[in-house]
Amino acid sequence: MKKHSARVAPLSACNSPVLTLTKVEGEERPREPPGPAEAQAPAGTEAGGRTSRHNWTCSQERLKKVFWGVAVVFCVCASWAGSTQLARLTFKTFDAPFTLTWFATNWNFLFFPLYYAGHVCKSTEKQSMKQRYRECCRFFGDNGLTLKVFFTKAAPFGVLWTLTNYLYLHAIKKINATDVSVLFCCNKSFVFLLSWIVLRDRFMGVRIVAAILAIAGIVMMTYADGFHSHSVIGIALVVGSASMSALYKVLFKLLLGSAKFGEAALFLSILGVFNILFITCIPVILYFTRVEYWNSFDDIPWGNLCGFSILLLTFNIVLNFGIAVTYPTLMSLGIVLSVPVNAVVDHYTSQIVFNGVRVIAIIIIGLGFLLLLLPEEWDVWLIKLLTRLKVRKKEETAESSGDLGTGPQSRSRRARPSFAR
């Protein structure tokens, strides 16, 4: 298998630690070996100056990533919460969730053109779109994107993508946006369970706890509104959407591995092409069977449809390519922060009741989501941190006791000459 640099997995809506399943698969740049001067660490002011300059550069880079992270978190939160609320608003006048799914997925075609525009602006070595396309097609194998590869490695993901979005949008018709957004956060727990079973990922007890919390939150959310038909169906739809998304990510890791930014953009554009070619017939059938019917095309809220599509496209662009400028964990926070945003909007625009059971369920699912953001070596880091704090406390205690011990001795030494007189 060929190696890639600057990797990112598509549809990173709830990957772990952000959005790359269970491992950070952002830019996998090997750490450069230290130079001779740094390796030998020469004594003197020169070595100290180099160390201070190196630390200053590292701190600047980290600070820059944090600032970018705040911007990315805001974009993820705003686009995800905005698309959810706009979909709910659209269904008041246009009751066609599958048609909305089809329309928004068509916009995936823009991924590769947008990526190429960024490549032309940023890259020093300019390539034509055809050259860049051929290079990215190597991701699918030595023969590139053949008809067989299209139907075996792209079509299944196109179906999963459509199911994920359709079930999510259909659930918004049944239950409020707050419940939908928080239940979709269980996606990370499902990814962990599937990757543990299928991909043989490392077992982590804290992630098992997170999965248990997610399941408990689903049960409590069902109990919050009572076991009414609309509530149960809506919750089942969201859980199904989260499951389809988790299956999408795990299968992508299993069959395709991870991709460069250009390869991911090409893959997502291919999903848009698949949607146009093979999914278009379904909205047509639903229209003529009056399952999703509207009187005239003038009744379609085109502004809402385009706004939802732009927000969803922005959400996926930021999640898939934001890893180039910030930490994956910061990006994931935008997903969970969209829950309180939806809660505030629902409080003022709908008749949602935040009873004790619903609030506890939201907290439990959110806690499980945050536990899945912990890195694999979090326990080692925690032990090191506690050890450092313990050593520092001992040093401070020793220094304070030393100061108390030297104080009387110094005073007695100063007092001795006066007694000698």
Curated annotation (Swiss-Prot):
Bilayer-spanning residue ranges: 66-86, 98-118, 149-169, 179-199, 208-228, 232-252, 266-286, 305-325, 326-346, 352-372
Q: Where is it mainly found?
A: membrane
Q: What is the name attached to this protein's record?
A: Solute carrier family 35 member F3
Family recorded in the similarity comment: Belongs to the SLC35F solute transporter family.
Ordered alphabetically, the record's keywords are: Membrane, Transmembrane, Transmembrane helix, Transport
* Functional description taken from the UniProt entry: Mediates thiamine transport.
Question: Region annotation Disordered: residue ranges?
Answer: 25-53, 394-421
Q: Where is the composition biased (Low complexity)?
A: 37-49
> What is the source species?
Mus musculus
UniProt GO cellular component terms: membrane
